[in-house]
Regions:
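Extracytoplasmic gating/loop element in the C-terminal half of outer-membrane beta-barrel translocons
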Residues: 243-342, 373-401
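Transmembrane beta-barrel domains of outer membrane proteins
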Residues: 1-5, 105, 169-173, 232-236, ...
């Protein structure tokens, strides 16, 4: 198919650019210091009736000052509902990155259109959350620190992270049949995935091993590899009217995810939410750094570890987003039929068969992901007197589920029309 592609080039374009880029500032980040002020407001108590509430500063509820606290308030202000006070570094800068792009477009004498493109993204100012009350109080047998936290989160900047992407594509028309083949690969890293508007959630839902000792890791939003193949053919099957067939196949890598301890509500390290402690991977049933509930549990856990990529991390912890979920592929078909009605008036009827693979086989074309890029595979019940995590079981497929909230894991048939004039 591609014989003679590079025999000679009739047109070549080199393009590129470099610059500092900043997106729209997410103002919601700044709102945390107002909604989590540590005691300047007492709305929660006011909403729920209490006899202890005395005279408020203003007499009329129509006056916004009715809800303000002041020296005339004769009741005791409790701590904030969330028990924390949050702030923003006065030198905080909105996220920005240096971006570079270089691309080469080629057209050959026999009609091939070929593109190579490279993109580099280097973080200039990233986002980092600190807990100003974080205090290391001990260490577990696996080496992770134990921390007391206050929940006083501080929005500040950090360097580190970025992305590299390489793409190539080949396009050619073969006597009415247009074919496209494209491939892209991405390597992207970040420190905080920043999936929440609230500071405590962005902080607590970031998988970690030891407190705030965080380094850039593969992004939760990265698609490692992606292939696209399409065929498009137009013929005149009904008089002089165009009949068009379009077929698009996509295959892409699964999302990154982390393997963590299933600890219930509480974290073993104290610096994250429960279930977001990165798992230490035992070397075997006799690993002195963990405590298995019994021999059967040890055998089940080690069988799971030895059966996959977890075995690469024996004797240490599995880093954040060190694993990939199942790959995904799908095939879409569109058929359109034009009907010339009168002069420039045209009726276009179209038929879409989305996820054709799932129509032919209900086990194909299914998107499977780990919820919030997190899989609590090692079940844990606290820590023993020697600082060893008590391992009670294993759940190899924890949080792995079929994603179908937009219908991406089922087939669909759409029939419609458009009238243009």
């Amino acid at each position: 198919m591609f014989d003679g592609v590079f025999d000679y080039v009739v047109d070549a374009t080199l393009r590129g650019g470099h610059g500092l880029f900043m997106g729209r500032i997410p103002n919601v980040w700044y709102g945390n210091q107002y909604s989590r002020s540590g005691g300047a407001t007492d709305y929660n108590r006011f909403r729920s009736f209490s006899d202890t509430i005395g005279v408020m500063p203003a007499a009329s509820v129509a006056d916004p000052r009715f809800f303000w606290l002041g020296p005339t308030s004769d009741y005791q202000v409790r701590g904030a509902y969330f028990g924390d006070a949050q702030g923003t570094d006065p030198d905080f800068e909105a996220p920005s990155s240096w971006r570079s792009n270089l691309a080469l477009d080629l057209v050959t004498a026999n009609g091939y259109e070929i593109t190579f493109e490279y993109n580099l993204d280097d973080v200039n100012e990233g986002v980092f959350y600190k807990d100003l009350g974080l205090e290391r109080t001990g260490q577990l047998a696996d080496g992770r620190g134990v921390y007391d936290t206050a929940g006083d989160y501080w929005l500040t900047n950090a360097s580190g992270g970025g992305a590299e992407a390489f793409t190539w594509s080949i396009n050619k028309n073969f006597n009415g049949l247009n074919a496209l083949l494209a491939y892209s690969t991405v390597d992207a890293e970040d420190i905080y995935p920043l999936t929440s508007t609230q500071a405590e959630s962005s902080y607590g839902y970031t998988q970690r091993f030891d407190g705030e000792n965080l380094s850039p890791r593969p992004s939760s939003f990265m698609i490692d590899e992606k292939w696209i193949f399409s065929l498009d053919y137009t013929a005149k099957l009904i008089g002089e009217n165009d009949t068009r067939f379009s077929l698009v196949y996509i295959r892409k890598s699964g999302e990154n995810y982390s393997v963590t301890y299933d600890t219930g509500y509480n974290s073993v390290g104290g610096a994250s939410y429960g279930g977001y402690d990165l798992a230490y991977i035992p070397t075997g049933a006799a690993d002195p750094k963990v405590n298995f509930a019994n021999a059967a549990v040890a055998a089940a856990v080690m069988d799971h570890i030895n059966s996959g990529k977890l075995s690469n991390y024996k004797g240490t912890y599995a880093p954040r987003n060190a694993f990939q979920g199942p790959d995904y592929d799908r095939l879409d078909l569109r058929i359109t039929q034009d009907f010339n009605v009168w002069n420039d008036h045209k009726l276009i009827v179209y038929l879409d068969v989305l996820n054709l693979m799932n129509l032919l086989d209900d086990q194909k074309g299914i998107v499977e992901e780990y919820s919030f890029n997190n899989s609590r595979q090692i079940m844990v019940n606290g820590v023993d007197a020697q600082g060893r995590v008590n391992i009670t079981g294993v759940d190899p497929d924890d949080s792995l589920s079929v994603i179908n909230f937009n219908g991406q894991s089922v087939w669909q048939v759409n029939l419609g029309f458009k009238y243009s004039f």
